[in-house]
Structure formats: C-alpha cells, structure tokens
Amino acid sequence: MDIAHDLQVIAAQEHTLVFPQFDADRAWQVGAYLHEVAKARGIPVAIDVRTFGQPLFFSLLDGATPDNIDWVRRKSNTVAHFRRSSYAIGLKLQQAGGTLADKHALAASEYASHGGAFPLTVAHAGVIGSITVSGLPQRADHELVVEALCAHLGHDYSKLALAKA
C-alpha cells in the first residue's frame, strides 16, 4: 500500500463527493442504501449518518456488536475534529509515526483514526457531519462509504476507488 497515493485519492474523494444540499430525507436514503448493500453482501456493520450533534440514521446489521457502535462514535468524532475522513487522518499519522494522543492530545477513548468515517460535505456550506461504517477492516469500511456516496451523487466509483490492497 502506497500511503502517499492513498492520501491523494482520499483527498480527491473528499473534494468530489459533495452534496448540493442535504436534509434528513437524504440522510435516510444514503443510510438505507448502505444498509441494503451491507445486508445483500452479508457484512455485519454499524451504519451512522449524522450532522454534527444530530443523528439522522443508524442501523446495526446482524453480527455487528456494541463495539461497532463505539467505533462509529469515535470515528465520527475524528471527522468532526479534523473535517477529514478518519482514514486520511490515520494514514497521515501512520506516515508521521504518531498517534492521535501524541500528535493532537486526543484520547483514544473518544477518537479513532481508523477508516470508516467520511465527511458529509455540502456545497457552499462545507463539512456538516459524517457518514460512518464500522465492522469491516478499516480500508473496506472507508470504501463502502465512498461507494455509497458515489451511487448517490452520480459518480463512477471505479474512478474514485482506492487501489486494491
């Protein structure tokens, strides 16, 4: 895995996957789409769509655990703090040889720099929340969210996907 290349691709994902507008109905549509994809693939994940401070969609598929709920919370907190995907933050820390605790004084009990939380960005408003998945390896969590966003925003996922690890 080439961290520098992945960071470039993630930056392109974050720049491209922007909603023209966003409301509770759109949150439900994106969350329900993620739920159906996960269910069809038989993957046990927790799914969370939220604006900062307000949950709009949550689902826990069969096989997901309370631990996944906590991962969702901590990954979402990371997006709220940095306004970047949790996977990008984790890769940047890996590249720098650090942790959220030693580089940013952020407690691991409240923040997670593992993939799966993606900034919910609205044109002319910026990052207003996050879309988070937990239950797969971090790269797969991240890519599941990107795949769903591409489907909803009319982008070709193959052009924004990370290279296979």
From Swiss-Prot:
Q: Name one Pfam family in it.
A: HbpS-like
List the InterPro entries hit by this protein, alphabetically.
Answer: PduO/GlcC-like, PduO/GlcC-like_sf, YBR137W-like
Q: Note the superkingdom of the native organism.
A: Bacteria
| Gene3D superfamilies registered for this protein in UniProt | Haem-degrading domain (3.30.450.150)
Q: Please state which protein family the record places this protein in.
A: Belongs to the UPF0303 family.
> What's the protein name?
UPF0303 protein Bphyt_1734
- Protein's organism: Paraburkholderia phytofirmans (strain DSM 17436 / LMG 22146 / PsJN) (Burkholderia phytofirmans)
